[in-house]
């Protein structure tokens, strides 16, 4: 089958339609399909929009329309046209033919847009967030925005590809953070900020047809539980959803990416293991070269060329949808600026800065660093201390084989990476009550 066969005149089409034994036009899908493929008004008019997962009418067909999406009013006009012109009246057969001809005439508006762009050679990704929002023009900001753009392009050309990153613009109330994401989506219908519930059965409907989705309200009210829900949501690559008029549910691979905005600096709950999915960029509107709405036409032109630059990188294939290991380490440290102060980690670090022994254990830190002299730690408190030592404290190395502590018995713990004692004598008893024994020391018996 070919949905784009050369148009014919109405009389030629009528002459070629299948007829009944009595000479009337046969009410068949084949006849309806022939009309949609060859009628001078309808040929090439109906297409399947891969982005919206809907049928569109993509050229004028003789009556006024408000949008491209095929709707109930359009169907009434089409039924009337096929009845009056060809005597085709079976609504179900006509609808089936529309489904077939649309499926044979697919298009993706974002792919078409991106593929049409030609870069002028001027670098903009590195300076964009500085230009519009006053962010630092450093390597981190450049890599953050570049990664987000490449993720968006990849999701358009490869729906459902793995991309778990959320670019978060932080600070600067009234700076234009939400407007930046809206203009980044190029067309307003490709942008949405209407995602409110992540556990909604109809969440696919909120994503459908959108490319850039801003999470503003959720980031503003985020807590430890909701952040975990957002992280889980970001990791999904598809939704399973049954459109009301369809019989069976189907996988709907994601074609969108998610951006976050927050006026509060400490929008990330404390997470010592890191929130690798969230990439925060601080904005300073007073340092911006231009407000993004000062000249919207110029801003859109700038952003369009930025997409063209990103497409050059995408076409080259020389990229990964993840930070480099060095940038990942920087991100982990940088994220701490956007979390509440970690008071327990600070207390443990202060204790270790003054401590002269060569090893410590969780119970020791609980009692001596966190000042629980007469209490016994609960299991979750032990896990929290372990997390602090393993994720936040440097200069100490974990040992898994229990050693003897004079006050706390046999315990797993941490030793200095460069052990130090008061006198330098390896056999001298340290403050933790443990006697260091040199590996090659001759035993006195």
Predicted feature residues:
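P-loop NTPase catalytic core of nucleic-acid-dependent motor ATPases
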Residues: 98-208
């Amino acid at each position: 089958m070919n949905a784009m066969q050369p148009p014919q005149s109405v009389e030629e089409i009528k002459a070629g339609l299948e007829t009944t034994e009595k000479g009337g036009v046969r009410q068949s899908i084949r006849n309806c399909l022939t009309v949609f493929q060859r009628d001078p008004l309808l040929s090439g008019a109906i297409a399947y929009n891969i982005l919206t997962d809907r049928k569109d009418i993509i050229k004028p067909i003789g009556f006024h329309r408000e949008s491209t999406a095929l709707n109930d009013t359009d169907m009434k006009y089409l039924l009337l046209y096929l009845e009056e012109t060809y005597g085709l009246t079976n609504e179900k057969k006509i609808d089936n033919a529309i489904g077939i001809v649309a499926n044979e005439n697919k298009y993706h508006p974002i792919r078409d847009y991106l593929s049409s762009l030609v870069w002028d050679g001027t670098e903009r990704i590195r300076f964009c967030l500085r230009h519009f929002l006053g962010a630092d023009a450093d390597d981190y900001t450049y890599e953050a925005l570049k990664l987000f753009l490449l993720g968006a392009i990849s999701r358009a050309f490869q729906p459902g590809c793995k991309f778990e990153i959320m670019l978060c613009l932080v600070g600067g109330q009234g700076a234009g953070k939400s407007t930046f994401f809206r203009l980044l989506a190029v067309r307003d219908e490709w942008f949405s900020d209407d995602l409110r519930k992540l556990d909604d059965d109809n969440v696919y409907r909120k994503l459908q047809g959108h490319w850039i989705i801003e999470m503003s309200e959720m980031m503003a009210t985020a807590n430890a539980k909701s952040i975990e829900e957002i992280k889980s949501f970001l990791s999904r690559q598809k939704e399973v959803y049954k459109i009301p008029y369809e019989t069976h549910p189907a996988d709907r691979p994601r074609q969108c990416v998610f951006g976050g905005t927050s006026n509060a600096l400490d929008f990330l709950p404390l997470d010592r293991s890191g929130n690798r999915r969230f990439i925060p960029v601080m904005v300073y509107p007073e340092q911006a070269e231009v407000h993004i709405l000062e000249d919207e036409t110029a801003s859109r032109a700038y952003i369009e060329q930025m997409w063209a630059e990103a497409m050059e990188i995408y076409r080259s294939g020389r990229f990964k949808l993840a930070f480099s290991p060095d940038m990942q380490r920087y991100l982990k440290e940088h994220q701490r600026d956007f979390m509440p102060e970690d008071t327990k980690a600070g207390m443990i670090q202060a204790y270790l800065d003054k401590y002269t022994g060569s090893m410590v254990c969780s119970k020791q830190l609980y009692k001596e660093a966190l000042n629980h002299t007469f209490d016994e730690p609960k299991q979750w408190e032990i896990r929290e201390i372990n997390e602090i030592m393993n994720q936040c404290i440097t200069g100490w190395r974990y040992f898994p084989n229990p050693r003897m502590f004079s006050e706390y018995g046999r315990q797993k713990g941490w030793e200095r990476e460069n052990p130090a004692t008061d006198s330098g004598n390896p056999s001298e008893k340290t403050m933790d009550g443990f006697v260091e024994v040199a590996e090659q020391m001759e035993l006195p018996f």
